[in-house]
């Protein structure tokens, strides 16, 4: 059996403001910084150590990982950053307040954009100032790969391809791996690992800054999973 740890970034500044974030590169809030520290403390106290780490190219996930590893005295381990672990791209919704958007388009439509597997939000245009394909951190993305909007299915395709090509071989080789990413990229990986249906994934939520531990067999099939609960600082099994 091997263990895999997934952690959604700590609370971000736009989580506080209730905005659609997507690929917008906002930082952690003060609470998010504390969540990342607590995650590191809990993981270390629970006996976890890591050989390798993966994260996105968005600072809220990278900073969460750095702080977590610092608390564990593991800042020296290899860290691989990839856009394929970025949050789902929310297209033209990025930056908009979720409540205001619901008032404009209706709760049902916004819920479809947020929770369904195959309904994309309105797309960005390439002349929009929020379109960041020219940023150096995206120099490895081909023009046709850079999203203007995504649904969860799109997100799952890129996350699972990176999992299969880069992460899974290391997990299978016995490496202790931590992935610091985002709500929807973790949902996408959880959907893949647990073979969750398109309908059931709509009800899956990933809390900020709380380590999610997967126990996997030699074929990387889940045996079980649980959260490390920051409130009681002990292992507590919870439904994902």
Curated annotation (Swiss-Prot):
Q: Name one Pfam family in it.
A: His_Phos_1
Superkingdom of this entry's organism? Answer: Bacteria
Hey, which family's this protein in?
Belongs to the phosphoglycerate mutase family. BPG-dependent PGAM subfamily.
| Record function comment | Catalyzes the interconversion of 2-phosphoglycerate and 3-phosphoglycerate.
Marked site positions, Transition state stabilizer? 182
Active site (UniProt):
9, 87
Give the Gene Ontology MF terms in alphabetical order: phosphoglycerate mutase activity
Question: CDD domains, alphabetically?
Answer: HP_PGM_like
NCBIfam families linked: pgm_1, PRK14115.1
The lineage is: Bacteria, Bacillati, Bacillota, Bacilli, Bacillales
Q: Which residues cross the membrane?
A: none
Which catalysed reactions does the entry list for this protein?
A: (2R)-2-phosphoglycerate = (2R)-3-phosphoglycerate
Question: What gene name does this entry carry?
Answer: gpmA2
Binding-site list for substrate: 8-15, 21-22, 60, 87-90, 98, 114-115, 183-184
- What SMART domains does the record point to? PGAM (SM00855)
Q: Which EC numbers does the record give?
A: 5.4.2.11
EC main class here is isomerase
Supply the alphabetized keyword list.
Gluconeogenesis, Glycolysis, Isomerase
Please give the pathway this protein is involved in.
Carbohydrate degradation; glycolysis; pyruvate from D-glyceraldehyde 3-phosphate: step 3/5
- The identity of this protein, by name, is 2,3-bisphosphoglycerate-dependent phosphoglycerate mutase 2
Which biological process annotations from GO are given for this protein? gluconeogenesis; glycolytic process
